[in-house]
Structures are given as C-alpha cells and as structure tokens.
Amino acid sequence: MSDVSGVAFGVFIFFFLLVTVLGFAAARWRRAEALDHLDEWGLGGRSFGTFIAWFLIGGDLYTAYTFVAVPALLYAGSAIGFFAVPYTIVVYPLIFLFLPRLWSVSHRHGYVTPADFVQGRYDSRPLALVVALTGILATMPYIALQLVGIEAVLKAMGILGEWPIIIAFGILAAYTYSSGLRAPALIAFVKDTLIYLTIIVAVIVIPSKLGGWDAIFGAAEEKFTPGPGVILPATGQLGYATLALGSALALFLYPHSITGVLAASNRDVLKRNMSALPLYSLALGLIALLGYMAIAAGTKPIGTDANTIVPVLFQEMFPSWFAGIAF
C-alpha cells in the first residue's frame, strides 16, 4: 500500500467505523417498544417522513455499484453507458401511478412484503411463494454487484483479496439484523451527504484542472470517433431505449425498493418523494461524466478492471484525504 493509498484508506476506515456504530445504534433511533414485530424491524414502524424516506429510497436505488459502473461504462463504451440516467428519470412518473395505491392497501391490511400483498390480493400461497423466491433470486446478483463496487474501491487503495469484502458484508449484515430498516435509513444520511459533497467538488475541481468541459468532451470525441462515436449510431438507439425502459419498469419490482416505499408514513410522503428523487438522477448524470473526465485526464484502470476508473481518477485529482472521503 502506497502512502497516498494509506491516507485514503485511513479516512475510509474512519467513515466505515462511523457508519458501523450508527448501524448498531439505529435500533435506539426512533425507538419502538420492541423490534420483534415485522412492521417495526422490517419497515421502521411505517413511520418515515418525507426527509427520511427520500434518503432511504435514494440510498437503496443509487448504490455503490451505480456510481462506479456508470462512469466506467461511459469510459469504455461511449454513450450506451448513459442509459442509467434516462431510466432513473422515467421511472418516477411510472411508479407515481401505482405506488401510493400499493402503500394504502399494504398499510390497511398490514402487508410487509410484495409476497404478502400477492397472497392477500389473490389468495394464493403458491403465487406468493413464487414472488418471494423471485425477489430473493433477483436480489442475489444485485448484492453481488454492490460487492464488485466495493472491491473496485478497495483495489484502488491497494487492498486486495476477498476477506475485506467478506468482513464488510458481515458487519453490514450484523447491524441490519440488529436494527432492521432503521440501520440503512440512518446510514443513508451519512452516505448520501458524502455523495453530494463529492459530486459538487468533483464537477468543479476536475474540469478546472483539465481545461474545462470543452476539453473533456473533445477528448471523449477523439477516443470514440474511430469506433462507435460519442453519439449512439442509429443501430443502437432501439436497444438503448428498450434498455432504459425495461430497467425503469423493473426497478421497483426489487424487494428492497418496495420496502423503502412501504416504510413511508403516508401516501403524501410517497408523492413528494416521487417529485424529489429525480435530484439523485441529476447527480447520477454528473457522476456519469466522470468517465469522460477520466479519458481527458489520461487515467487508466487497474489492470483490465474498468470499474476502478473512478477511484483511480479521484486519487490522481484530489489529495488523499478527500479521495478517502469519496471512497
């Protein structure tokens, strides 16, 4: 581990320990009489207001892998990687049509999961079991992608091997088991605040060091002109559109997405959040452009792992302590 990586790793460890303490302390935050009821443990007592729900749902949807992989896609494959931005914009008008109704029915009948809803509405345990198993199977690769994002960050700091990832996942699982949904809700405050801080600093500092946005887009155009080009060719537009639309239709079918929705205290909380959550999409659009910034800066990934391009870019552009905050 280099000295630079050592400083970044030290700051990273500080924030990791901070969120670990917050995760275990979350059981006492907005404390109920007991967490042994599924409503309290799994949905935070269905008591989250607009502010908390905004951080929780945003933190659930815009994950570590999202912020690592989307710029990596733009770095490696030009415009196709930008699909994540329109799909996270289109999704909110779509779900505005049915999520408030889903919340009302679930609140009235005490449903905690999508499988509970299906069993209650269709009186079919086999169908509810299929929905539950589908959710579990769909979530497994989703979790794996988050671990890939963590691995990319650790690799940039010179930390190799599987044990650091296993330990981090084990600690996360432990405080989630202990505190229920209150843990990710409380941690989302810290995580998302750091994300917005990092984005604001990055889009100001990095372009100023690289000669402005004109130089950044010029470097991207120079790289991709011999190949697919910065703009999608006509043959790729249908695939781009269907990828974005399909992703939007699927996003709130994931169990963790529905959990954040059902934890809201009332329908109006959801309506306000559907209006405010696109702020995360704006942030994602700026983060995606980090891929083009890496091209302009001449940044190279570690080995063949394009997912490391953003962590490496931050190590090159910022002091080690700020890189640690970003990580």
Task: Go through each PLM region and give its residues.
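Membrane-interface "cap" regions at the ends of multi-pass membrane proteins
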Residues: M1-F67, T176-S179, T198-A202, A263, ...
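Interfacial loop-to-helix junctions that mark the boundaries of transmembrane helices
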Residues: M1-V11, A76-Y87, L154-W163, L186, ...
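Membrane-water interface regions at transmembrane-helix termini and the short interhelical loops
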Residues: S2-D3, L73-G77, R101-V105, V148-A156, ...
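Membrane-interfacial loop-to-helix junctions in multi-pass transporters
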Residues: G6-F9, S47-T50, Y122-L129, G158-I167, ...
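Hydrophobic alpha-helical segments and their helix-loop junctions in multi-pass secondary transporters
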Residues: T20-A34, L99, T139, I143-L147, ...
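Membrane-interface helix-loop-helix modules in multi-pass membrane proteins
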Residues: E40-G110, G239-A250, S257-I302, V312-F327
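Small-residue-rich segments of transmembrane alpha-helices in multi-pass membrane proteins
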Residues: T50, Q119-A128, K191-V205, P278-A283
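Helix-loop-helix module between adjacent transmembrane segments
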Residues: F82-S179, G246-A250
